[in-house]
């Protein structure tokens, strides 16, 4: 168990160190890019200033050369007889002088280019050394502050964890309240429906009771009417029988009131 814990802790430290080293390398690369851009801009501005100075010096040199040629050009020479001498020697001297000046100018331009190349090499070497020095200083500073950076990272991780836990608890509490509110709403709805059904059931029971009472009343009325009809029939039957008896009595009474017939036999002689 101890070995596994030490291995996991070493792996976590190694992963953290690798992450820090990657971050440091990215920051160093970004700082190097910015430094290169700044130096390239400064070199470009210096070159532009040199070109402007060279162009001004060239224009000044050409102007001064023309002035010198005008001042150095000898007057037209004549012989003892007043004839103009040939200008070939003067032209040759002028061409020779121009060639010498051109050589001097070319040498000057070569020296300027050589100086620019040397300055550029010096600037590049200086920039490289400065960059290496800055990277070394940054590496040393990061190495010195490694423990502090790790503690800060752990602190921020713990703080982010606490914030996430708090947000999660708040979200769970909101969900719980929402579920309770929904459950209460469902219970209220079910209670309302139940009360409505009970009300409907009571109303139906009342209607059924009223209908049953009315039906019982109707049945009693029908029974009473049937009893009355039966009594009426019995009464009519009794009256009919009574009348029939009276009629029979009358018929029988009439028979009794007739003269009696005598059926006597005479004596034979």
Curated annotation (Swiss-Prot):
Residues 1-109, 233-269 are annotated as: Disordered. Disruption phenotype: Morpholino-mediated knockdown produces embryos with expanded brain ventricles and a curved body axis. Embryos have imparied movement without lethality up to day 9 post fertilization, after which they die due to an inability to feed. One of its GO terms (molecular function) is pre-mRNA binding. Residues 1-57 have a biased composition (Basic residues). One of its GO terms (biological process) is regulation of alternative mRNA splicing, via spliceosome. It is found in: Nucleus; Nucleus speckle; Chromosome. Keywords: Chromosome, mRNA processing, mRNA splicing, Nucleus, RNA-binding. This is Arginine and glutamate-rich protein 1-B.
């Amino acid at each position: 168990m101890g070995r596994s814990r030490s291995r996991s802790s070493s792996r976590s430290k190694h992963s953290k160190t690798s992450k820090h080293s990657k971050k440091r390398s990215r920051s160093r690369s970004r700082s190097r890019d910015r430094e290169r851009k700044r130096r390239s801009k400064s070199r470009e501005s210096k070159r532009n200033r040199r070109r402007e100075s060279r162009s001004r010096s060239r224009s000044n040199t050409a102007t001064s050369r023309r002035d010198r040629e005008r001042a150095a050009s000898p007057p037209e020479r004549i012989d003892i007889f007043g004839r103009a001498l040939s200008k070939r020697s003067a032209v040759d001297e002028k061409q020779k002088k121009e060639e010498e000046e051109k050589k001097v100018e070319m040498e000057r331009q070569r020296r300027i280019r050589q100086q620019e190349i040397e300055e550029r090499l010096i600037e590049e070497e200086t920039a490289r050394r400065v960059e290496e020095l800055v990277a070394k200083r940054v590496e040393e500073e990061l190495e010195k502050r490694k423990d502090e950076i790790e503690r800060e990272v752990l602190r921020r991780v713990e703080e982010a964890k606490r914030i996430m836990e708090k947000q999660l608890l708040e979200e769970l509490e909101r969900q719980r309240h929402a579920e309770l509110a929904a459950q209460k709403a469902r219970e209220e709805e079910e209670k309302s429906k139940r009360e409505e059904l009970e009300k409907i059931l009571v109303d139906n029971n009342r209607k059924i009771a009223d209908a049953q009472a009315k039906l019982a009343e109707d049945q009693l009325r029908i029974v009473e009417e049937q009893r009355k009809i039966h009594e009426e029939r019995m009464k009519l039957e009794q009256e009919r029988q009574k009348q029939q008896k009276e009629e029979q009595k009358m018929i029988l009474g009439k028979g009794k009131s007739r003269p009696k017939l005598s059926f006597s036999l005479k004596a034979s002689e």
